[in-house]
Amino acid sequence: MPLPKIEDARKLNDQELADEIVAVKKQLFDLRLQQGTGRLEKTHEIKHARHRLALLMTVERQRQLQAQ
């Protein structure tokens, strides 16, 4: 699975962006929980979730700065 693209995040509206950030944070929590209990087989999924979260938060911050 390739890493997500920033263009995909920029297409989301503000509410979808906020919902996606919450969903990725939950996914990251679940992945870390699985890693801690030794049940995580695809460890690269943590990297993908962190990358996606950073990407979404960057887009959110860019929109905040544009609104000022």
From Swiss-Prot:
<dbReference type="GO" id="GO:0003735">
    <property type="term" value="F:structural constituent of ribosome"/>
</dbReference>
<dbReference type="InterPro" id="IPR050063">
    <property type="entry name" value="Ribosomal_protein_uL29"/>
</dbReference>
<dbReference type="InterPro" id="IPR001854">
    <property type="entry name" value="Ribosomal_uL29"/>
</dbReference>
<keyword id="KW-0689">Ribosomal protein</keyword>
<comment type="similarity">
    <text>Belongs to the universal ribosomal protein uL29 family.</text>
</comment>
<keyword id="KW-0687">Ribonucleoprotein</keyword>
<dbReference type="GO" id="GO:0022625">
    <property type="term" value="C:cytosolic large ribosomal subunit"/>
</dbReference>
<protein>
    <recommendedName>
        <fullName>Large ribosomal subunit protein uL29</fullName>
    </recommendedName>
</protein>
<dbReference type="GO" id="GO:0006412">
    <property type="term" value="P:translation"/>
</dbReference>
<dbReference type="InterPro" id="IPR036049">
    <property type="entry name" value="Ribosomal_uL29_sf"/>
</dbReference>
<dbReference type="Pfam" id="PF00831">
    <property type="entry name" value="Ribosomal_L29"/>
</dbReference>
